[in-house]
């Protein structure tokens, strides 16, 4: 399972996120999108070497996140189970020649032969 798909299941979980610049964000996840952008509510934002600031809502861009600190009470086994089974691609049927394969079949003599 991809990390982003796992994180998308963490709605209403309280987590801490450390950013690449050393900032610590502690809040409740309201959503995570496919770019790992994380939206939180009831946030306590602690800039490196500064006093904490309380915010109602905060969105963190995914590429700024260093790591998530998940609560110990979180049941990882149930979250890691994939909800939808993967669909296997269909194999081509026997006896059928796929179009667009090979080099120049059925298109005449080709180029640059000089009429030999």
Curated annotation (Swiss-Prot):
Residues 102-116 have a biased composition (Basic residues). Residues 85-116 are annotated as: Disordered. Transmembrane segments: none annotated. InterPro entries: LSm4/Sm_D1/D3, LSM_dom_sf, Sm, Sm_D1, Sm_dom_euk/arc. Residues 100-116 are annotated as: 8 X 2 AA approximate tandem repeats of G-R. It comes from the Eukaryota. Keywords: Nucleus, Repeat, Ribonucleoprotein. Pfam families: LSM (PF01423). GO terms for biological process: regulation of RNA splicing; regulatory ncRNA-mediated post-transcriptional gene silencing; RNA splicing; spliceosomal snRNP assembly. The keyword Nucleus applies. GO terms for cellular component: nuclear speck; nucleolus; plant-type vacuole; ribonucleoprotein complex. Belongs to the snRNP core protein family. SMD1A and SMD1B have redundant activity, but consistent with their expression level, SMD1B is more important than SMD1A and either one copy of SMD1B or two copies of SMD1A is necessary for the plant to survive. Involved in splicing regulation. Facilitates post-transcriptional gene silencing (PTGS) by limiting the degradation of transgene aberrant RNAs by the RNA quality control (RQC) machinery, thus favoring their entry into cytoplasmic siRNA bodies where they can trigger PTGS. Does not participate in the production of small RNAs. This is Small nuclear ribonucleoprotein SmD1b. It comes from Arabidopsis thaliana.
